[in-house]
Amino acid sequence: MAADISESSGADCNGDPRNSAKLDADYPLRVLYCGVCSLPTEYCEYMPDVAKCRQWLEKNFPNEFAKLTVENSPKQEAGISEGQGTAGEEEEKKKQKRGGRGQIKQKKKTVPQKVTIAKIPRAKKKYVTRVCGLATFEIDLKEAQRFFAQKFSCGASVTGEDEIIIQGDFTDDIIDVIQEKWPEVVDDSIEDLGEVKK
């Protein structure tokens, strides 16, 4: 009678099925890791570059790829039969699932590479110099801000997404200083706007 009870359930003595071992699995388990994302192949679908992972799996392990596509096909058929169609699938791809890194955004270089320098009046006879566009040349704005503050012995701060404000009128010297420090910024790409109101 006791033997019947122990054989009938795969659970432990407390009745917890989580601690029971899989009966059809051979131990130690052999796990197949993806060559693209270095995770087990079951987790590739949660990575942002799923297409690359699937291509790698199809090329190197076609048997596993066939198993994976067979497992995923009932889910896709159920979604289409409910009337969602391809619009629902695209909407699902846009939303980030819980966990994971989300989609990796590609940098777009549509902004022209141009540095603009302007002198802005502050109070009475005081001015600040505004430098915009250094980020289009892949220049770290924090590093540039520290460099300007040290070079001109004044206060400098990063105020906008691509804007550095230097306390003082340095429009004459700053063009030469920028070209000395960052040679990739050529003379044609620097524009002096002169005195501009805030």
From Swiss-Prot:
Compositionally biased tracts (Basic residues): 95-110
Fetch the InterPro entries from UniProt.
Answer: DENR/SUI1_TIF, DENR_C, DENR_eukaryotes, DENR_N, SUI1, SUI1_dom_sf
Phosphoserine PTM positions read: 20, 73, 189
Ranges of biased composition (kind: Polar residues): 1-11
Q: Which residues carry this modification: N-acetylalanine?
A: 2
Keyword presence, Aminoacyl-tRNA synthetase: no
Q: Which residues carry this modification: Phosphothreonine?
A: 86
Organism superkingdom: Eukaryota
Q: Where is the SUI1 domain?
A: 115-182
Q: Name one GO cellular component term.
A: cytoplasm
Q: Name one Pfam family in it.
A: DENR_N
GO MF, any single term: mRNA binding
- Keyword entries, A-Z: Acetylation, Cytoplasm, Initiation factor, Phosphoprotein, Protein biosynthesis
Q: What compartments host this protein?
A: Cytoplasm
Mainly resides where? cytoplasm
Family membership? Belongs to the DENR family.
Annotated NCBIfam families: DRP1
What's this protein's function? Translation regulator forming a complex with MCTS1 to promote translation reinitiation. Translation reinitiation is the process where the small ribosomal subunit remains attached to the mRNA following termination of translation of a regulatory upstream ORF (uORF), and resume scanning on the same mRNA molecule to initiate translation of a downstream ORF, usually the main ORF (mORF). The MCTS1/DENR complex is pivotal to two linked mechanisms essential for translation reinitiation.
Q: How does it assemble?
A: Interacts with MCTS1 (via PUA domain); the complex regulates translation reinitiation.
Report what the protein is called.
Density-regulated protein
Gene source species:
Pongo abelii
Q: What is the lineage of its organism?
A: Eukaryota, Metazoa, Chordata, Craniata, Vertebrata
